[in-house]
Amino acid sequence: MTSSTSVAMTTYPASFASDPLIARVAANLALVRARIATSAAAPERVRVVAVTKTFGLEEVLAAAAVGLGDVGENYVDELESKRARISSTTLRWHYLGALQTNKIARICKCADVIGGVSRVRELERIAACHTEAVIYLQVDFTGANGRNGASPSTIDELAARARSLELNLRGLMCVAAPGEQAAREAFSATTRLADALGLEERSMGMTEDLEIACELGSTEVRVGRALFGPRVSPSTLA
């Protein structure tokens, strides 16, 4: 679900001005789209996922009101709760966090897109749920302990297993280490891997590095603070 609206064409109903949150999200979305427009070769192909983790239902509804069709959560409890309380059939819900095998069945029931997949056993658990969710494999180039994601050397094996299980594998997801050079290296390598595997989606880029990601081939950016402002929790992963 990509947006074809350029920043120059972005207009919203006058009634938005009466809701301060929607007005603020609309203004911030215009800024995000402007950043994409200055860096992506094909800005219309870059999907914006509104990362609503730790935010309330109001932010999810504001994102939908300004035309965003994709929202992302990192915690299964939040994903379940918000999806159950919002009746929209047009929103596409992304699970973006690390996967715990004992929670995969719950995730499969409420996620339309499952990112962060980095192990064969996770793929097998997802397949056992008979879900049609879109799957992204997460790749990590740092090798650091505690970071989610598979080593680049194992991505071929994971992709082959996902396909053998007949999962809806569509792309790769990457969270770059801090710093421009690290981001450039990670995003370039992710694009090369996706191309080699014949995967059309590259979920790369967040609030602080989306320009670099778009320049290097991202088809999806995941932004929270750029749309909604500071989080109420100390997490800064989006």
Place the predicted regions along the sequence by residue.
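Active-site loop ensemble at the mouth of alpha/beta enzyme cores that anchors a bound cofactor
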Residues: 234-238
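Conserved alpha/beta-domain cores
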Residues: 2, 7-201, 206-208, 214-216, ...
